[in-house]
Regions:
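Interhelical loop and helix-boundary elements at the membrane-water interface
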Residues: 2-23, 61-71, 104-125, 179, ...
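Short juxtamembrane and helix-loop transition motifs at transmembrane-helix boundaries
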Residues: 4-11, 56-62, 79-87, 110-113, ...
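Catalytic cores of Mg2+-dependent Asp-rich isoprenoid enzymes
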Residues: 6-49, 53, 190-201, 208-258
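Helix-coil boundary and interhelical linker segments in multi-pass alpha-helical membrane proteins
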Residues: 27-46, 78-91, 131-152, 203-213, ...
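Solvent-exposed interhelical
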Residues: 48-73, 155-197
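Intramembrane alpha-helical segments
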Residues: 65-138, 226-227
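Functional transmembrane core segments of multi-pass inner-membrane proteins
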Residues: 120-170
Length: 258
């Protein structure tokens, strides 16, 4: 019983500290490095990991007040990483930071998060900038059609991964944030998600070799199942742990099937 309790506490720490979501984002980035044959650069990975922790911390708070020493260390490390990146990678980080700031801070009493349907696309776009374009620019990879296809594919996938969170938050978002569940209902949201999963898998089938296709097919089906079983009343671990686990599981599959 004690070991189970300790595991639960550890999982709670990973979730509350935003370490787990950072692991999820970095898993997508490493998957891109594997697929494209890129080097996994220390500074790019470091700034993505700790930058995600910082971004989600400020989003939860709704302001930019730093209340812990550990977060100050994260910020300092991110600055250190930033000045060791390629200039194109720095532009990605700056763009992501600007979007994160306006996602949180209101302009004329509104932030990007409060604009109808914008929330999900901003989050997905930031994930793709960090997980796809950051490692590509840092490794000076030649941009080709495949890069655009995988960007679109991952963008679609991340949108579907966000939908269970929007379903969970429907009762909180109704009065202040317009999302697909609050505007069109849970059933419509799930149907939309299934269509997007199908699109994600279709793109994968035509652009990827077998090992990547198998990894993405399994991960896509798991994503669809998590969406199917999503509801407004759910365990606190359903989205924050299990849904966030999908990119991590995908990376493991990708490594095993190479």
């Amino acid at each position: 019983m004690k070991s189970i309790f300790n595991i639960k506490n550890f999982i709670n720490f990973l979730i509350k500290s935003n370490v787990y979501v950072a692991m999820s984002v970095c898993s997508l980035m490493i998957s891109v490095c594997i697929i494209l044959g890129l080097k996994i650069h220390f500074f790019a990975t470091g700034i993505l990991f700790f930058g995600t922790i910082i971004s989600y911390y400020f989003t939860k708070q709704g302001n930019f007040i730093i209340r812990s020493t550990s977060l100050i260390l994260c910020v300092l490390f991110c600055f250190f990483c930033f000045f060791n990146l390629q200039w194109k990678s720095q532009i990605i980080i700056i763009l992501n930071s600007i979007l994160s700031i306006f996602y949180i801070l209101p302009i004329r009493k509104k932030n990007l998060r409060s604009i109808a349907f914008v929330k999900i696309f901003i989050v997905a776009f930031c994930w793709i900038l960090g997980s796809v374009w950051l490692p590509i620019f840092e490794d000076n990879y030649l941009i080709n059609k495949y890069v655009y296809w995988i960007s679109l594919q991952y963008f679609i996938w991340v949108i579907v991964l966000i939908l269970p969170f929007d379903i969970r938050d429907k009762k909180y978002d109704t009065l202040k944030i317009i999302t697909f569940p609050t505007k069109f209902g849970v059933i419509f949201t799930k149907i939309l998600g299934f269509i997007l999963v199908l699109l994600f898998l279709t793109i994968s089938y035509f652009i990827n070799k077998n090992s990547i296709w198998y990894s993405q097919f399994i991960s896509g089906i798991i994503t669809a199942l998590f969406l199917y079983f999503s509801k407004e009343q759910q365990s606190k671990y359903y989205c924050n742990f299990w849904v966030e686990s999908v990119p991590i599981f995908y990376l493991i599959l990708l490594i095993l099937l190479q």
